[in-house]
């Protein structure tokens, strides 16, 4: 989200509670920043790890959440090998995702779809609408097709500008993506991706 900080704790709690659709398994939060979402994930008594690239945020998290000490990963999520994170165990992906890389985060999710049965979090409203769009919709596109091939997408709720400091120029939205029953598309996945990108 850049330098727009979520200040409404009720919204943060609501976002954190979206992980409850996949109970018991570990949680990976991407881009925790100052921990506004993290503080509501920790009481769930699950194995919570956070990935943060910004040095100052990492230092703050270590100070504010000592119980997270060994579970703070200072790294670029887009370059990580997610297979090793929880010893090959499936996990929930969540976060107030940085809007400038949210699409890349979801492409990364698709690479590890067999490890990620559930992905929730907050993104730009326009992107959320695209991901959740049905065939024939004006917003139906590459993200819609690729994600919906493997996940059932639910647009949960809209988050308005005034709950951030400073308020961004765009609305946000919270979505939930649950892995569907598809295990094989019946064609080469790379070819499928290329065809979809060419089509749109």
Where are these regions (language model features)?
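Catalytic cores of RNA-modifying enzymes
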Residues: 1-198
């Amino acid at each position: 989200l850049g330098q727009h900080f979520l200040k409404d704790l009720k919204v943060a709690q609501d976002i954190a509670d979206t992980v409850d659709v996949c109970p018991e398994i570990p949680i990976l939060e991407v881009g925790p920043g100052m921990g506004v979402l993290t503080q509501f994930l920790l009481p769930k008594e699950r194995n919570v790890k956070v990935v943060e690239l910004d040095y100052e945020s990492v230092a703050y998290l270590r100070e504010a959440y000592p119980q997270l000490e060994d579970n703070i990963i200072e790294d670029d999520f887009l370059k990580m090998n997610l297979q090793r994170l929880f010893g090959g165990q499936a996990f929930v992906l969540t976060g107030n995702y940085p809007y400038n890389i949210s699409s890349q985060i979801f492409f990364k999710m698709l690479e590890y779809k067999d490890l990620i049965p559930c992905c929730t979090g907050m993104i730009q409203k326009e992107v959320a609408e695209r991901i959740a769009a049905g065939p024939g919709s004006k917003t139906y596109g590459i993200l819609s097709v690729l994600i919906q091939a493997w996940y059932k997408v639910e647009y949960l709720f809209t988050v308005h500008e005034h709950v951030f400091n400073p308020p961004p120029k765009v609305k946000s939205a919270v979505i939930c993506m649950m892995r569907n029953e598809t295990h094989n598309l019946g064609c080469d996945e790379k070819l499928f991706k290329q065809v979809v990108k060419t089509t749109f």
